[in-house]
Every structure is written in C-alpha cells, then in structure tokens.
C-alpha cells in the first residue's frame, strides 16, 4: 500500500471517471482532472467540447456518474447549495447577473450565506479596490454596464462568497482583448491571494498564458494534459487551437 501524499500535494478538486449529459445524450466520457490548492488550471477546447457540462456536473447542477471530491470530501450526495457552502463557486458563462439590481446589490448576493456584516463590508471595499470600475458603478443597474464591466461584476460576486475554488466559464466570450488581458491579470492576483481557479476557455492562448497546468477537452473527453507551457508548445495544440505560431515573438 502506498503512503498518503503530504497535504500540500493533495488535490483541492479531484474528478475521476466523470460521465454526464442531458437525458439520453451523453456529453462527458470518463473525464478525470485534478486541481491543487493555489493554482490556476485551464480547461480548454472548442465550442461544444463539453467544458460547461463538466462545470455543471461538478457544481451538482446536473446528474453525473463517477467520483468528485472537493477538499477531501465526496460530492456524491451533495446538492448545489452544499457545494456552494463548501467554497466551490462558479462564475457562469454569460455572467448571469441580476440585471435590474445595482452592482452593489449583485455583489451582496454573492455573500448571501454570510452573516459577518463587518467582513462583508470589508470584502466590498476589497472588490472595489480590485475592480475600480465597479466602485464607479456601484449604484448603477448591472444590466446597463458593458460586457467587460459585467464580467468584473460576476467575478467580484463570486469572490464575495470567499471561495476556496472559483470556476470561471468562458470569461473572454465577446470581450475586447484589452479587457481580457485586464481580467487575466486580476485572476493572477486573486490566485496569489490564495484563491484556486479552474478556468474554462475557448481562447486557448489567453487561458494558457495565466495557467499553471491545463487540460484539452474534445467531444467530452480529455485528450491532452500537462503544464501550460508544455501545452502551448505541443504541435497538435498549436495546430488545432493556436494557429500558425511559427516565428512568433
């Protein structure tokens, strides 16, 4: 029998043999992945690869088969609310803000389970420091903001829950490159403060530019995994997702 790995080497999120889908349509096939504490892991692949389905299964929003462990605990019997309470929080594709509520009201919704008023006030100030645009817009209706500002609000709302793991779905979708770069820089700062990130992205270059490790998903299966730098230099990944990078500087 092998010895238990030291605590620092254990995964915060461990997924093994995950199958999931919708009704009779199977989308995921034997998906396995690990996310260790205080790292950014990218799950990349094209539209329809199954990445969002994977997040929904991990969040217990859809039924699945296989093993999911978070912080050493099985999620087999967990509800979506249980998962949120454990500190596994999702930033959904399309932001899904409360459009007719103010920015600050949206942020407070992220802290709806919390009862520490002083801590919530402190975290609101922290979110406004991380995302200065939100401080300017705190009383504005969330639905009236630009796409980039809405993505900032969605990320800040998730952080108000004080997550251990933040799963971000298609952060770059529909955003200008300069806004994507700003959000990626912010994600790195968040990771450096101890929040683990699982980033699901079609923009492979953007995701791998900030990730420590990555996985490539195609038609519901993991087809490649490794360090972000190794995936960036993989000829098959370059050909399929990064275009002609020959001679790039």
List each language-model region with its residue ranges.
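Glycine-rich phosphate-binding loops of nucleotide-dependent enzymes
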Residues: 2-249
